[in-house]
Regions:
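SAM-dependent transferase fold signal centered on methyltransferase-like domains
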Residues: 1-212
Length: 212
């Protein structure tokens, strides 16, 4: 879009920013013609298909970042890809390998961003998933740590209903987090129960008046 590119260039100039070069080109042609080495490539594929239809699979986005990734990796040590908030986490590891880091960012109870950090080094650390609640903190879980077969047994009565942050639910980390803090997880993406209120729960805490 030449108009948007021109507007961005003018805005950078008005702000006194001189270290940004605006290039209006297709991602495929730019990567092919780029002769340097970048510290990082940030890709935000357009998630609109024919007829302005929303798409979620990377193969349907523009550019097709999965097909373009080998060429990008030749030009940078690190690639960060922005995905749809609806994008499946397991699919990210299937497409980009088991050494990626997936950040799931929420704000005010809504999943806002899914960011996939793809390293180029073959000896990069094992992959991980990070749940980030804007303004509240983050939790990191290694991809290969394994999920506990179950958390603590269901033994009512409980004193508190714990509602995990949506980023934990999206990452399917509720049971692993429950095992970490010693509470009972009803499901992989649902709520938890605890006899005592955790000191710092990654979500919301409600007292239970009575359990039938």
């Amino acid at each position: 879009d030449p108009v948007t590119a021109r507007v961005a260039a003018v805005n950078f100039s008005l702000l006194g920013i001189s270290n940004i070069e605006v290039v209006n080109d297709s991602a495929e042609h730019f990567i092919e013609s780029f002769s340097g080495t970048a510290d990082l490539v940030y890709a935000d594929p357009a998630r609109r298909g024919e007829g302005n239809r929303k798409v979620f699979r990377f193969e349907e986005c523009s550019p097709d970042i999965v097909s373009l990734l080998p060429a990008i990796r030749e030009k940078t040590r690190r690639v960060v890809v922005k995905a749809s908030p609806l994008f499946d986490i397991d699919e990210a590891f299937r497409l980009f390998g088991d050494r990626i880091t997936v950040d799931i960012v929420s704000r005010q109870g809504e999943c806002k961003e899914v960011l996939i950090d793809v390293p180029s080094a073959p000896d990069a650390p094992a992959g991980s998933v990070r749940a980030v609640a804007a303004g509240c903190g983050s939790l990191v879980f290694g991809r290969g740590d394994g999920e506990p077969a179950q958390t603590s047994d269901f033994e009512p009565p409980y004193g508190y209903l714990l509602v995990p942050d949506v980023s934990l639910c999206k990452a399917r980390l509720v049971r692993r987090y429950a095992a970490r803090i010693g509470c009972y997880a009803v499901s992989q993406s649902g709520y938890c129960l605890s006899r005592q209120a955790p000191d710092r729960f990654f979500g919301r805490v409600y007292p239970i008046r009575e359990m039938a």
